[in-house]
A protein has these predicted regions:
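Central cavity-lining transmembrane alpha-helices of secondary-active solute carriers
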Residues: 40-57, 282-295
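Extracytoplasmic gate region of multi-pass secondary transporters
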Residues: 17-18, 226-292, 366-372
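Cytoplasmic helix-loop-helix junction between adjacent transmembrane helices
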Residues: 95-135
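Intracellular terminal tails of multi-pass secondary transporters
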Residues: 1-10, 14, 18, 22, ...
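Helix-breaking motifs and short loop linkers at transmembrane-helix boundaries and internal kinks
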Residues: 13, 28-32, 63-64, 85-91, ...
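Extracellular/periplasmic helix-loop-helix junction of adjacent transmembrane segments
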Residues: 20-50
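Structural signature of the two symmetry-related core transmembrane helices
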Residues: 67-81, 90, 288, 307-337
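Glycine-rich segments within core transmembrane alpha-helices of 12-TM secondary carriers
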Residues: 123-154, 158-159, 168, 173-177, ...
Length: 486
């Protein structure tokens, strides 16, 4: 519960920023039409989220989860402070870049902690499902939190400006929770715990007792090299990674595009104010709740495939991870059409809101399908596959919102929604092809063939790979540790 709470808290600033657009445009003299220049701060947040984990998450494999949590969380707080007191727009863009990076590192470590504690597909199903929910909901809750704060904030002057209170409030409650996290969080990284025990025994007995990780520790340079090079190679040469990255990246880009387009469509069509549009965007979170409720059914379908696996009897097949993501992807597509064509004055506002909710169901379903499939199919290379997908996902989240104003203004709400829906429909083919032809596709992949575990240590090694692979759920790429502890 505590680590999932961290996932929500560190995701909130990503979505809450846009609630202060009107105030920031006046304060910084930044024009938001026809090009949404204020979206550069969202772009910088997501680019930080894409890049920072590649460098910093691998380091936690040696130092442990606890130092990583608190260093990342304190840096996150410091750059929230910088955003709150920014005196110009350039400062805001820069501080959000570092804040987004620290947020993503923190969330990645949350994913690692889950895999440290819960071993095996069945045991990890519920924690993974909840973590996937908090990863989406933390960002999706941001617009409502931000709009509620500016609605009751002070005048648009000086340090008491409404938009600054978005950061003040988050600074206060995040700082207040640091002691709580310190009390409840414990180190979960197994080899770090063993190193501490070995060190204690050496001190108490004087005997040369060492943990295996102390004797066979990869260098930081090697960790960082693999953390950058292998995901890049997979993103350029592995068709599954390429198409799954496009699939999840488009869905993630829509999540961030909605932060501006919902304000645009509901403000123009229904005359909704900032707080009302923030409430509308809660529909994405509600969609993620629905997806979470149905996720145990997906896990049940997946575990049943173990009896049909001829390649590795007794093990569920990777394609079993995608069964509900196919209808989920179609719901995502249908929700985009519904949102676009129902955003008209003669249609009640609840109809496009339902469309937003359906899109939220689809985003969650796609998200979980991609993460779980790549983890199963690539096993010991799961960390690198997820790094590639996460890099693309955050890059789309950075740049797709830049198209929001021109897309909906030039095409109109209906055709803009249709264009997005057609792209979503085309990408819905990806999981269907994998379910039908997955075995043949995996047989042609050098990475998948090499990564398949076997032998007496299969379960232990698979769990080790999952340790960093699951971290890809978080919102930034995991480290490369899964590529070493096998």
């Amino acid at each position: 519960v505590t680590i999932c709470f961290i996932s929500i808290l560190t995701g909130l600033p990503a979505g809450s920023y846009g609630a202060g657009n009107d105030w920031m445009a006046q304060r910084f003299n930044v024009q938001n039409e026809p090009f949404p220049n204020l979206a550069w701060a969202t772009c910088s947040w997501n680019m930080g989220a894409a890049l920072f984990p590649l460098v910093f998450v691998p380091l936690t494999e040696n130092t442990g989860r606890m130092p990583g949590y608190f260093v990342a969380y304190i840096i996150f707080e410091l750059f929230l402070f910088g955003s709150a007191f920014a005196d110009n727009f350039a400062t805001l863009v820069v501080t959000r870049f570092f804040g987004g990076g620290a947020s993503s590192v923190s969330i990645n470590i949350v994913g690692g902690s889950i895999s440290d504690v819960w071993k095996g597909d069945k045991a990890r199903s519920l924690p993974m499902s909840l973590f996937g929910f908090t990863s989406v909901a933390g960002i999706a809750l941001g617009p409502f939190i931000g709009s509620a704060i500016v609605q009751i904030g002070g005048p648009n002057t000086g340090l008491n400006a409404s938009w600054r209170w978005i950061y003040y409030v988050q600074l206060i409650y995040n700082a207040a929770l640091i002691p709580v996290f310190y009390l409840f969080l414990k180190e979960t990284r197994g080899d770090v715990i063993l190193k501490k025990r070995a060190k204690k025994l050496r001190k108490e007995t004087g005997r040369p007792i060492y943990a295996e990780s102390e004797l066979n520790k990869p260098s930081v340079v090697r960790l960082l090299k693999v953390s950058f090079m292998r995901p890049t190679k997979m993103l350029l040469t592995e068709p599954v990674v390429i198409f799954f990255t496009l699939w999840i990246s488009f869905a993630w880009g829509i999540l961030f595009l909605f932060f501006s387009s919902v304000v645009q469509t509901f403000g123009t069509t229904y005359g909704f104010g900032i707080l009302a549009t923030g409430l509308i965007q809660l529909a994405i979170t509600f969609g993620a709740v629905i997806g979470t409720v149905f996720n145990p059914f997906q896990d049940w379908l997946y575990l049943r495939t173990a009896s049909k696996n001829q390649e590795r009897p007794g093990h569920p097949i990777p394609e079993g991870r995608l069964y509900t993501s196919i209808p989920g992807s179609l719901l995502f597509t249908g929700g985009l059409f519904m949102y676009g064509w129902s955003s008209r004055p003669d249609v009640h506002w609840i109809v496009p809101t339902i469309g937003v909710c359906i899109v939220g169901v689809g985003i969650y379903s796609i998200y979980m399908g991609v993460v779980n499939y790549l983890t199963d199919a690539y096993e010991k290379y799961a960390a690198s596959a997820l790094s590639a997908a996460s890099l693309g996902r955050n890059t789309f989240g950075a740049f797709l919102p830049q198209a929001s104003y021109s897309l909906f203004n030039n095409l109109g709400f209906g055709w803009a929604g249709s264009l997005l829906g057609f792209i979503g429909a085309a990408l819905s083919v990806v999981p269907a092809v994998l379910v039908l032809k997955g075995r043949e596709i995996r047989a042609r992949s050098p990475f998948m063939l090499e990564s398949t575990f076997g032998g007496e240590d299969d379960e232990e090694r698979k769990n080790n790979a999952g340790l960093t692979g699951v971290a890809g759920v978080a919102g930034g790429p995991p480290g490369a540790a899964g590529d070493y502890h096998v």
